[in-house]
């Protein structure tokens, strides 16, 4: 399924990793979806076929921001690569709060205890090696191995997340093909006759005590693939940031003409 896209990926890979900002189209029409939810945020999309990038809020799109629990995407890749977990049904036996939780459940629910235990089992040096190997954001681990992504050590920009997503989809990351396929399967949310939608969310609290949320994914229509990243933050303590970032993502996609099978 992915082979028809591969040529386009190779052609735009330099854009993704060196000068995507210079090729971006600014779309301020998307601002209303963030305003209506009373959040600050950004949205970025890559049209893989054309190499076009659409951005709302370029300033935020190029800032490195705390990963929060969106770290689960790369941590799952590392966990499978190192054999600490093997598939979607993998459980972790050492931590009482997560020993009966499967990878699939933890991934869907942003389970902090599960991914903390997985990080402890992988180890700090191994995690650091893999973060460095793909230049994942600032690749910074300065606090404890089971909390650095929660304590605002590890940061990545939405623009960098977009490049990471495209490599994941095309299995171009330095991980086993099986690991990348497993993560892609965990991200799949909707599969209809008109479109297929995949994404992973991430939550957290930043240094200024803002609640924030990520939504990272791709949508496919008529064998055309589009990658997107949404980030939101609010100074108001909120328990529904995940719902809001998903809703905003879908509103932006709808504004851009998706979900009709006509792209």
Question: Would you name each region that the model predicts?
Answer:
Residues 21-31, 37, 120-123, 169-192, ...:
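Structured C-terminal helix/loop/strand segments within mature extracytoplasmic catalytic/sensor domains
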Residues 26, 81-97, 175-180:
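Short, well-structured active-site flanking segments
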Residues 64-88, 106, 228:
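Active-site SXXK
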Residues 86-109, 126, 130-140:
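Active-site helix/loop module of the DD-peptidase/beta-lactamase fold
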């Amino acid at each position: 399924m992915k082979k028809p896209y591969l040529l386009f990926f190779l052609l735009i890979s330099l854009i993704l990793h060196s000068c995507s900002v210079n090729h971006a189209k600014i779309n301020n029409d998307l601002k209303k979806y963030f305003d209506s939810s009373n959040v600050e945020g950004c949205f970025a999309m890559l049209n893989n076929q054309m190499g076009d990038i659409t951005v709302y809020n370029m300033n935020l799109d190029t800032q490195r921001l705390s990963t929060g629990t969106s770290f689960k995407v790369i941590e799952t890749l590392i966990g499978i690569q190192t054999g600490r977990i093997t598939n979607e049904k993998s459980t972790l036996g050492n931590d009482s709060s997560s020993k009966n939780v499967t990878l699939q459940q933890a991934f869907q629910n942003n389970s902090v205890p599960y991914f903390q235990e997985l990080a402890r089992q992988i180890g700090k040096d191994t995690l650091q090696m893999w973060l460095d190997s793909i230049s994942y954001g600032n690749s910074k681990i300065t606090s404890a191995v089971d909390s650095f992504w929660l304590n605002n050590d590890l940061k990545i920009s939405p623009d960098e997340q977009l490049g990471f997503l495209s490599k994941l989809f095309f299995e171009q990351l330095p991980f086993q093909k099986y690991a990348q396929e497993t993560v892609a399967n965990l991200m799949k949310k909707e599969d209809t006759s008109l479109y297929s939608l995949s994404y992973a969310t991430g939550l957290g609290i930043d240094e200024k005590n803002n609640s924030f949320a990520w939504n990272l994914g791709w949508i496919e229509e008529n064998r055309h693939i589009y990658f997107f990243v949404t980030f939101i933050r609010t100074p108001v303590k909120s328990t529904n940031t995940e719902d809001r970032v998903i809703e905003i993502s879908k509103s932006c996609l709808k504004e851009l003409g998706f979900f009709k099978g006509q792209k």
